[in-house]
Amino acid sequence: MVTRVGSGFSVQRVWLLLVIVVVLCGSVTQQASAWFTNDECPGVMGNRDLYEKVAWVCNDCANIFRNNDVGVMCKKDCFHTMDFLWCVYATERHGEIDQFRKWVSILRAGRK
């Protein structure tokens, strides 16, 4: 009889551990997707690849000038700033300006 109680107790521990793992995994997933939902760009959900391409310009610009504030200002208002255009030229991607404008308009879709 003691072995049953002992084995029942270990089964409870296993279930408890399983529940904790599932809850923690769900929490991590929500935090990862929150980065995109809390962003200033309403069209980023479903367009993460576009967001990454446009954000890459800002990251490169911040690296060129060794100043994180440049990258932050570039991404402000969902890339709809003169700082973003300045970074496009600073990273010598001015030939792609029309493509970047299309991508930014997609990312800004639904914005009030």
Swiss-Prot record:
InterPro entries per record: Crust_neurhormone_CS, Crust_neurohorm, Crust_neurohorm_sf, Hyperglycemic, Hyperglycemic2
Keyword Disulfide bond appears in the UniProt entry: yes
Disulfide bonds: 41-78, 58-74, 61-87
Keyword tags: Amidation, Disulfide bond, Hormone, Neuropeptide, Secreted, Signal
Gene Ontology, cellular component aspect: extracellular region
Gene3D superfamilies for the chain: Crustacean CHH/MIH/GIH neurohormone
Cell compartment(s), UniProt: Secreted
Signal peptide location: 1-31
Tissue/organ expression: Produced in the eyestalk X-organ sinus gland complex of male and female lobsters.
One GO BP annotation of this record: neuropeptide signaling pathway
Pfam families per record: Crust_neurohorm (PF01147)
Record family assignment: Belongs to the arthropod CHH/MIH/GIH/VIH hormone family.
Protein's recorded name: Gonad-inhibiting hormone
